[in-house]
Amino acid sequence: MLSPPKFPKKERDSHSWLLLAIAILLFPFTVLAESIQVARFTSGERQVSYEIVGLESSGPLIIMLHGASGPGVPLYRGLAQYFATKNYTVLFLHYFDAADTFRASDQNYIAWEKAVSDLVGECRKNPKWSNRKIALLGFSLGASVALAAGSQAIPVNAVAEWYGSLPDEFFFRLKGMPPLLILHGQHDDNITVANAQQIMQLCRMKSFTCGSHIYPDQGHGFKPPAYDDAVKRTLDFFSYQLR
């Protein structure tokens, strides 16, 4: 049975690239032989790229948002290919293209959130995708971008965020939130668990549809078996919300 690829404990780990290189060689990509296609669209007068994985899949779309290390981390593509084997089409968005810097500033969050919203608009204009349901899946900084987009009542069917936070700029101008899954580590010293708890409280106050799980032994980034559990929870959540 094909298993999801393994992420390193932390994106900032100095040995991440070695771990990724080893893991990527072990991951059986031959199961999914199709090549990754690259497309572009305009957002805020800038050209933004995204990779399409699972183009032949007929199921829902997942817009995947990378973390602070950027889209070059190979295992994001590995996870995208794993989701494609489950009949999802994954759009791996290079949202950094939408701003001049990679800094997590209010200005950049606004540009990145707009890129996500504009990509959803592109999907709705595409005859092959216009009737498909859409989910957002973000990791760390990308999870914060997904939450920012969700807070503006973006017309998607689900949002899954792994160890992110809702940026203050978007917290204060909240418009809504699609059904949300929050996954976080109790010992996260990068984006603390208080951020997840704040979003959970917001969901209760606003009566948003929200599921959550706090891993008691995890930090920023999940190690097996928590990682495998997070993948399963995400797939189960999408299967239910995108049915």
Where do the PLM segments sit?
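Short beta-strand element of the alpha/beta-hydrolase
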Residues: 59-67
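Alpha/beta-hydrolase active-site loop
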Residues: 106-126
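The serine-hydrolase catalytic nucleophile loop
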Residues: 71-79, 95, 195
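N-terminal cap/lid segment of alpha/beta-hydrolase-fold proteins
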Residues: 33-55
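Conserved alpha/beta-hydrolase
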Residues: 87-100
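C-terminal catalytic histidine-bearing segment of alpha/beta-hydrolase fold enzymes
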Residues: 207-243
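Active-site glycine-rich loops that stabilize anionic/oxyanionic intermediates
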Residues: 66-71, 186
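Short beta-strand/loop motif that positions the catalytic acidic residue
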Residues: 182-184, 188
